[in-house]
């Protein structure tokens, strides 16, 4: 364990959080941590922008380590991470200045990329070269993980595995969040402690498929609507994740705007409900009336769901409405 990013003289944001592990046999692993305070906003930006601040910092960190330790192509070098960390590892494998040194990328629940990012990858390598780099990438995802389907998945299907996971005990958001916890992907010893062996391989679960459906819908939107929707959803996750003691801004100071809220409610939400209705009709063969009742139940759940972020969101909407009324 050496050269952690948080000991580099303030060169990197705390959210970058990376370090190098060197094994006795000389193999080197560069590991990136997943989302923390400010990172959810960066996740949203990753669905609409060519690159994000945290992706670029992850790449910079890898290049710094490669130059500092004089790594060459004769070294065995692996990049890895969970969630946002997995996304960073993928980005490093493609876009770092020393990307040619990466032998393999192992992403755990790491999300995909925007159309704009993929275009930049292809511009750098050409189509054939891009496909060749992707062969280095391997994905390990919880069967019902809801993060890895976000954006455009670039890891080849033949290199992707879904792992049977157990949700957190309890109910509500905590149980839901457990579907994305890395420790749930590993087997347990007789004392219930996680060991360094992945759980049984399985197929993608219902929640994972539903997240993939939502992501496909989101990525099909015009850029302005896609940006508003991504910011809306990720702002909710940011508020929920940091709680009362944290902030609600991205690492670059970005946050949800009133324009994002307006676009999401007026243009994106109706399209989403229509898409969900069509999906229900197609997948389950329900008649339209039955499908509409199901959609109504989802809407009612959203309205009456309890929690601090819902209160903050409703308050923000009310404040926005008051401001608009005062302008009339």
Stretch-by-stretch model annotation:
Residues 81-85, 89:
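Gly/Ala-rich beta-loop-alpha elbow adjacent to hydrolase catalytic centers
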């Amino acid at each position: 364990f050496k050269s952690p990013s948080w000991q580099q003289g303030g060169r990197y944001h705390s959210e970058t959080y990376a370090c190098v592990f060197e094994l006795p046999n000389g193999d080197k692993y560069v590991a990136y941590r997943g989302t923390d305070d400010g990172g959810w906003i960066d996740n949203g930006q990753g669905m609409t922008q060519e690159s994000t601040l945290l992706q670029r910092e992850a790449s910079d960190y890898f290049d710094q380590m490669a130059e500092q330790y004089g790594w060459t192509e004769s070294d065995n070098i692996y990049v890895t991470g969970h969630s946002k960390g997995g996304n960073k590892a993928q980005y490093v494998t493609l876009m770092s200045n020393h990307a040619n040194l990466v032998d393999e990328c192992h992403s755990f629940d790491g999300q995909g990329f925007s159309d704009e990012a993929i275009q930049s990858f292809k511009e750098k390598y050409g189509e054939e070269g891009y496909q060749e780099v992707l062969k280095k990438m391997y994905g390990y995802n919880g069967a019902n993980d809801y993060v890895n389907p976000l954006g455009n998945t670039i890891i080849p299907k033949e290199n992707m595995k879904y792992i049977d996971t157990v949700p957190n005990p309890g109910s509500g958001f905590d149980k839901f969040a457990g579907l994305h916890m890395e420790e749930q992907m590993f087997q347990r010893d007789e004392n219930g402690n996680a060991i360094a062996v992945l759980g049984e391989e399985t197929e993608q679960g219902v929640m994972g498929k539903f997240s993939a459906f939502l992501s496909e819908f989101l990525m099909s939107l015009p850029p302005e609507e896609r940006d508003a929707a991504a910011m809306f959803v990720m702002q909710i996750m940011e508020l929920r994740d940091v709680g009362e003691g944290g902030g609600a801004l991205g690492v670059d100071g970005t946050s949800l705007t009133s324009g994002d809220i307006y676009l999401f409610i007026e243009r994106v939400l109706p399209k989403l409900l229509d898409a969900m209705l069509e999906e229900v009709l197609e997948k389950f063969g329900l008649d339209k009336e039955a499908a509409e009742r199901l959609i109504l139940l989802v809407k009612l759940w959203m309205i009456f769901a309890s929690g601090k972020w819902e209160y903050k969101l409703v308050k923000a909407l009310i404040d926005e409405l008051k401001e608009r009324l005062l302008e009339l």
